[in-house]
Every structure is written in structure tokens, then in C-alpha cells.
Amino acid sequence: MKKFSEKGLKNVKVETAHSLAYKHIVFQNNYKVRPQGYKIYEIAELLGLEGNGEKHAEYIVANHISKFISYFCNSDKARVQDLNYLEIVSDPKAKTFVSTFYNYIKRKTRLLLSKMDKGEIEITHDFYLKKFQLVSPKLKYDYILFDEGQDASAAMLDVFFKQKATKVIVGDTHQQIYGWRFAVNSLEKADFKTYNLSTSFRFSQDIANLAMGVLKLKKIIEIEAPFQIAGKGTTKKIKSKAVIARTNLGLLLKAIEYVTEKKKVKNIYFEGNINSYTYADEGASLYDVLSLYNKKRRLIKDKLIKEMRSMEELEEYIEKTEDVQLGMMVEIVREYENKIPNIIKAIKEKHIDNDDKENAEMVFSTVHRCKGMEYDTIQIVNDFITKEKLEKLANEIQKDELNIGKLNEEINLLYVAITRTKSSIYIPETLMPPELPSSKQIHIIRVAKEKENKEATTQKPTLKVNTETDGKEKAYSVDELRTKHKDAYKPWAEELDNELTIMYCEGVNVKDLAKHFGRTKGAIRSRIKKLELKELYG
């Protein structure tokens, strides 16, 4: 906006979809907006949800109501009943639960929306954007340019497409990574003449070739990506360095490695601040989950976690709600246990403030948090989808549209991560596209095979964290963890439980079970306890 003002262009306005909606809806209706949305326990209390005899059912229902509202508000549908919420539920246990309580969930979803509409309670950001779409606004502009179109929701697009102005939508369909926020493939929905902007002045042709090589993996899921990128960037002096991961867990593992092994790194910075990686959107923290793990419920601050009597109850809640953030926290707690406070303390001691970000020796970020940003050199964490994993999953899903979309987004995540660099990249060999020529700007990190000597690898420093709580020392290998635990967040389906039971009865130890199922030892022990295998089979 400042640039337009400096040029004397007073007839140009820069708005987000939400800022437009806010002016048209919130002001005119005198609504009060709830900044952070409603927490699960708040929804349960507001609607007077009942447990119906099933453990924590009121909170599980509230979780699905929250997601159903988000699904509806981001859609272009006029009524809640025009959507089938079950279509976006994939976990078998979650699907069973939602099927059982579907009418109840739908009815209470409509009730919560009605309360917001009448002004009985504060409205959410999703709500006023949805209401903006439903009133079919006529915007008095001659030209409308929609940037970052690949991230648009169906509700945003509906408003955009209905305008009489000359419309332009800009975006990169391969940078669509917000499917979990119900972003749609908007660029393909726009029946406009296409003009390709295929030249990047950020990076060189070698990096462009790497990015295109990743996009070619889409052929595995039968998606054509005939996308040519011309890299016109020039090599620059290395100032900013970043570590980019797919998940919070992958990023935390790498950060621990830097603060415990690479002592020379004194100043680090987390995009979005370190606290955002230790707290879930709902407010639960790693410390809450750790307190539950240690059976010290009196120390738990989050109301939802405090309702859980054990880790098993929390994991059951996670399975029935598909709460990915809580699931990751459980994995971290089971892996690091009481070392977590010292780990977070060590990271925070080296973390610098936002104003001093340029002085950070290393920036840490997930792909979602650094989208739109750039760094001189980057290191990719080994927690993205590999060609081998992609081929395996593609054979399993049998052209299910929902899962194909998720795999497409997994490829996009790696593509977005790679294209954050301006000069060079350090990337695990498992993530390298086949038949790519060598380059001085692309540094391949060797990933050791399981049988190889750990000390012989080029990028597998042993990770040791000492605490005063138990006097023990535990060693971790970041890439080994990712290799072993590649299925850590995959739901425990019935066939997997049967396989686990058989192997347990055959005397296979926990370490080998963890390796076989691609999960942590803590997760295996938890499942053995949940299935009561020790009680049944000794």
C-alpha cells in the first residue's frame, strides 16, 4: 500500500478477504469478534453437550463441531446440511464415532452458528467471512487482483467470481499446502485465460531443476505437472541460513541436535516464535501432556487435558478426533519424557527476539510458517515424503480423491521448502529426485542404512540430552528416528492391531516391533497396553 501511495495512486486498495468481510459484516451488525476462536471445552459448555455414556464423548463431539463449522464456513455451500462432514474424516475410529453421532453433531453445529448469527455469543473470523459470502456482496471496483490464489477457500472464491469487475487471479497451484484449512484448487476452477510466470529471480537453474524434479513425482499419483521453471537468480553471499521441516516434531529433533551437539551455534530463531511450537492451537502445551504422562494431573493447566485420566485416554481422544497437533505432542513426550523441560530451556536460551532475527545464525521453521519467505541457504529435514513412500501409499489408496489430494499436498510441501533458497541447499539423499545432475549449489546429505555403522555417516551426529531428573543419558539419531518412525501418525487399523498381536505372541521385542511398524518404542508399548496383550498373553 505504501508503494502505491508513494506513486500517487490513491485509487488502489489492498485488502485481505477477512478485512473486506470485517468492514461489511462486523461493523454493520455490531458483532463482537472472538480473537482466538472457541476452545473445545468452551464449545462443550456453550452447547451443554452430553457424554452419552462414552468416555469424553462431549469433548470429541465438540472437536468435530469445531471442524464442521470450519468446513462449512470455508465452503461455498449455503447450508450446513448441504455438506457431508464424513467426507473429510479419514481415521477409522473417528469415522465410526462421527457416523454414530452424525445427526447430533450436525444439529449442534447449526446451533452454535445460530448463536453467533444472533449475536448471543462472540463470532469467529471464519463466521464473518462466511456471512460475507452468503450476502453476495457487490464490490465497487473496476479491477480485482487476487494474489496467492492457490490458498483461497471456496467461500473466498465464490465472492471473487461473482464480481462484475475485470478479475485477475495469481498463484502457483504447486504451492497449495493448506488443504487442511479447506483451501481449494482455485486456479483450476478459474475459467480464465492463463499466462505463465515461469521465471524465478530468486534462485539459479540448478535449484529450478531440483524443484521441477520434485514436481515430476506427481506422475506417481497420476497428476501431470508439465511445469517449466527458468532460474535466473545469481549466487549471493551467504548471510541467512534456515532449517526447514515438514512437521513441528521433525523441526524440534533438528533443533535439539543444533543446541546440544553444535555448540558453536549461539543464536537461533524460530519463525513464529518458539512458543508456537510447544503449544497447540487449542492451548494445550507440551508440559500439560508431560504432566499427564507423569500422572501429575494437578499440574495440568489446559482444561481438556486435565479431563484425561491417562495417556491412553488422551490417545483415544486423538484417534477419534484426528487431532494432529496433540498427536505430535504425545509422540514428543513419549520420545523425550522428562528431558523435555531441559530441552526447551536449552533452545530458549539460544533463541533471540523477533527484532534481532537478522542476527540469528540459524533460523528454524516448518514449511507452513516460512511460506513466502526466502533464505540464502537452507537445510531440508528428513521428514518429508520420499519417492519410495509415495509409491507405496499410491498403491494402497486406490485413487481415493481425498487421499490423492493429501499426497499431492505432501509433494507440494517439499517443493515449497526447496524454493525458499536463494543460493544453495542441503538435502537428504532420500528426497533427491532421480537422475538429477550434480551441482555445487545442491549438497546431498547421506542417509545411513540401518545396518551401517552410525559413526560412518556424514550427517548423523548422535544426539545426547542429559537431565538431572533421572541421571540417564539417551542417544538419538535424527535421521534414524525419521526412518524408524515414518508411520508414527498413521492410525492403528484393525489389521495392524492383529499383526501386532501375532508378533507379540511370537516373542518379538519392543525395539524390533517399533522398527517393523515404523513407530516409536513408546507408541508400541502404549498400544500393547491398550490391547491388554500382556494381560492376555503374558
Where are these regions (language model features)?
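P-loop NTPase Walker
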Residues: 1-31, 212, 419
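ATP-hydrolysis module of ASCE/P-loop NTPase motor domains
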Residues: 29-112, 295-318
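Conserved helicase/translocase motor-coupling segment
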Residues: 236-363, 367
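Conserved helicase motor core of SF1/SF2 NTP-dependent helicases
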Residues: 15-20, 138-139, 143, 150-232, ...
